[in-house]
A protein has these predicted regions:
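Acidic interaction surfaces
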Residues: 1-167
């Protein structure tokens, strides 16, 4: 695949599989696809208002994170973040909103992205077979979760093989 940024081959029993991590360009920004984030504006050409933080900038336009509203939401919804033992609800909400801002800012700064993991069965010559499985919309920074996904996708491929040959 042309957008694969990492590829490796793994063995499972007598079978070989190619594992590809592929940029998922079809994912919406995290604040549009997931709950639990503070309000983020569209691109706007204006100055920051009180209670806002600049999340991202490009050619004089900005996306603003409504930090004041995020803290209010965090308090009501019980958001939390490490170290998880904040002395007050206000401190917890403030820290959680700040962690949310940093998480979203990291996405804006390409410090993480969404990806797809594609597992493809390889023949004895290392060429791809028609059996594959994939999962998309995964955060790029989740190696433990990636391993779980890879194991499940290999299992899915093996299940497809056994279903095809009737074993």
């Amino acid at each position: 695949m042309s957008d694969a940024y990492r590829t490796e081959t793994r063995e499972s029993g007598t079978m070989s599989f190619r594992i590809e991590w592929v940029y998922d360009h079809d994912c919406d920004p995290p604040w549009d696809r997931e709950d639990g984030h503070g309000p983020v504006s569209d691109w706007e050409h204006r100055s920051k208002r009180p209670g806002e933080m600049i999340l991202d900038s490009n050619r004089g336009s900005h996306r603003f994170y409504d930090f004041a509203q995020a803290v209010k939401t965090a308090r009501v919804e019980g958001w939390n973040t490490a170290p998880f033992d904040w002395p007050t609800n206000g401190a917890r909400a403030h820290a959680a909103a700040l962690a949310d801002f940093k998480y979203l800012q990291a996405w804006c700064n390409d410090q993480w992205h969404y990806c797809g993991i594609v597992v493809t069965l390889l023949d004895a010559d290392g060429e791809p077979e028609s059996v594959d499985a994939s999962l998309w919309g995964i955060e790029s920074e989740g190696d433990d979760y990636h391993e779980e996904v890879i194991e499940e996708l290999i299992f899915e491929c093996m299940h497809e093989i056994t279903a095809t040959i009737g074993v």
